Amino acid sequence: MEKLTTLTGVGVPLRRSNVDTDQIIPAVFLKRVTKSGFDDALFYAWRRDPNFVLNKPEYAGKGQILVAGPEFGIGSSREHAVWALHDYGFRVVIAPSFADIFYGNTAKNGVLAAIMPQESVELLWKLLEEEPGREMTVSLETRTVTCGDVTLPFEVNDYVRWRLMNGYDDIDLTLQHEDDIAAYEKMRAEKFPFKPKTIPAKHWPEEKIESAREPDDDWTGPLADRGII
């Protein structure tokens, strides 16, 4: 996963509260079997409106920092919501509050969910709307957002901050314990040699396997009448 320490990019003001995951990416797009390529599905219903913020030339395909209202990412649990934001280009989402599951999914996928007071978000909206296409700088090192001459602090979980700054996804974290895992597997194989094994399909068990009905059985009545069930 790509490291995130400091990001300078176009800030996008999204003056909407209680944005749920179905608004971020409709369920119809969840049928895809890949983890990427969801940028076209981000805010799909809203982007059909020509006046939606991401359809404005100052923001279309350029946004990297999204500034939204409280309770962002509520609704059903779908990691696709974070994938869609990331695929579009957003590495940071700023809001007064986030849904817990969505917040957890951001860190796993290289997106920072930065928590700011409502008054700070309102100020950022004002600054971004006064100068569409304006760039902002987000620093995980100092936990601050700078927009023009204004610098504001944000909150981020220490563990989330550590993961993002080091670019650790779940696989990276697991591989840090590779030696411990190998040692445990070795110990388990030696101490518990009777662990169950799956029989390969080409080998048949020695005992005969009886079926409920033999191939030459012509019984057509209910199985219950034969005492089988």
Swiss-Prot record:
GO terms for cellular component: 3-isopropylmalate dehydratase complex. It catalyses: (2R,3S)-3-isopropylmalate = (2S)-2-isopropylmalate. GO terms for biological process: L-leucine biosynthetic process. This is 3-isopropylmalate dehydratase small subunit. It holds the Pfam family Aconitase_C. Catalyzes the isomerization between 2-isopropylmalate and 3-isopropylmalate, via the formation of 2-isopropylmaleate. Heterodimer of LeuC and LeuD. Residues 208-229 are annotated as: Disordered. Its EC number is 4.2.1.33. Keywords: Amino-acid biosynthesis, Branched-chain amino acid biosynthesis, Leucine biosynthesis, Lyase.
